Structure formats: C-alpha cells, structure tokens
Amino acid sequence: MTDEFLWIEGIPFPTVYYSQEIIREVRDRFVVRDEDTIIVTYPKSGTHWLNEIVCLILTKGDPTWVQSTIANERTPWIEFENNYRILNSKEGPRLMASLLPIQLFPKSFFSSKAKVIYLIRNPRDVLVSGYHYFNALKQGKEQVPWKIYFENFLQGKSYFGSWFEHACGWISLRKRENILVLSYEQLKKDTRNTIKKICEFLGENLESGELELVLKNISFQIMKERMISQSCLSNIEKHEFIMRKGITGDWKNHFTVAQAEAFDKAFQEKAADFPQELFSWE
C-alpha cells in the first residue's frame, strides 16, 4: 500500500487528484476570505452528508441545486489540483470542502473570520468505511486485506494519515468562534437540532417548512438516488461504495475481539485529552 501513497510533509495522500506543489501552495498562498465557509473532515466521516446539509440550508431546503450540480462543483475540495485555481478566481462568498489536517490547511484561515465546520466520527466506523471505499477504488487491483488495513490505520499509514492527529488538531481549535465541531453520531441521533445548530453558526434562519424540506432531502436513500442520477453528469460509476450504508456501529460487524481491544488501547493512549462530549458513540 505504501507505493500508492503520495507523501507530503509526512502525510500519505492518494496519488490521484493531489500534488505536492498544489498542497503546499494551498497551505502557503491560498487566501481564505472572511465570508468563506469550509467543511472539513477526515475521509469517510460523513463528508458527503454534511456537504448536502449545508447546501440545502443555503437554498432554504430547495433541492434544485443539489439535484442539478455535482458535489465537487457545489463544495469544491480546496486541495484538488483542478479546483485550486478555479477557487482562486471565484468572486463572492465561497463554500468549500477539505480533508486537510491543520498543519497543511491554508495559513490565511487562522487570521480570518471564515467559518469551518469540522465533523468527527467514531474512528472505528471510519476505519471500516475506509476499508471498503479505498479497496473498491482499486477496481481489479490487489485488495488490501482487512487485517493489514486495520494495522495501517492504527499506525497512521492510511490515506490522509493518522485519524488521531487529524482529529486532535482540529478539536484543539473548537473554542474559536469561527469553528464548529460536530459529531456524526449526534447528527445521526438528533438531526433536526444539529441542523439548527449549523444554521445558527452560519447565520442562516430556516422557517419550519424549510427545515422539513432539508430533512426530507438528506435522507440516506434520497441522497443515494440523487448520486445515482448524477452519475451521468460526472462519470461517477462508484456511487454504490461512495455511500455504502450510512449507519453507526458497523465496526462491530468487522472487528475481532482482539482488534476491538487493540483499538481501545490505542484510543486511550492517543485520544485521552479529547472532549468526552463529542464521543456519543457505542
């Protein structure tokens, strides 16, 4: 798996869509504006779901935008090679997304009033989702066995590096007024009130009917159908594993007892200082 990594500042990235030159340029030269909003996650943490929610909030629940425009055009990834230059020349408030850890994030953000929403998810479920997703991307190439993927994840040798370091970096900024940290599990458990919290953070107000439209259009099944219908717009043929289950606790169907114990030990060692209120998972 190591040969498939593009190593940037000690972080392993996929070799597709990313380049050392662009990542460093994003960090050092990309100008984040005060009116920008950026959705940040570690991969497979509910990224697509949160993107859809924010887009629907901005359109007052009207699904036209999310139905007619693919996600990467609505919320472009800052670090993608093709997106960086497009975003640089885009005028007005920008809605963007990123998977970058804080040490590679645009430096200009930290002196701006731009808003970041960071979504954290049970790393056990992140591991399982990533295992299925990244293996599916291989399409005919040799798959990474579950045991090896598990070990790589704990060692920070999976795409985008250590989950623990990524989460720790962003969580450490949670007291800043322009950063909102949410958990996938809480969003799943209490979607309505979590959306209200997002609205308050963004300065958006939804009438009751508009909120109901947002809730209707972010159900897992509707989002999956929407992605399938958009496959012709973007040549997406992998919607079935981009959105696999959308559930919590799936790790219990994959971890052995020994793996669960090993993960618990690693979590206690590496995440001891994390705020416990974020860990609403089983």
UniProtKB/Swiss-Prot annotation:
Changing C232S: Decreases sulfotransferase activity (at pH 7.5). Its EC number is 2.8.2.34. GO terms for molecular function: 3'-phosphoadenosine 5'-phosphosulfate binding; sulfotransferase activity. It comes from the Eukaryota. Optimum pH is 5.5. The active site is at H48 (proton acceptor). Hepatic sulfotransferase involved in the maintenance of bile acid homeostasis and energy balance. Catalyzes the transfer of sulfonate group from 3'-phosphoadenylyl sulfate (PAPS) to the 7-alpha hydroxy group of primary bile acids to form 7-monosulfate derivatives in the pathway of bile acid elimination. Displays high catalytic efficiency toward cholate, chenodeoxycholate and their glycine and taurine conjugates. This is Sulfotransferase 2A8. It comes from Mus musculus (Mouse). The lineage of its organism: Eukaryota, Metazoa, Chordata, Craniata, Vertebrata. The gene is Sult2a8.
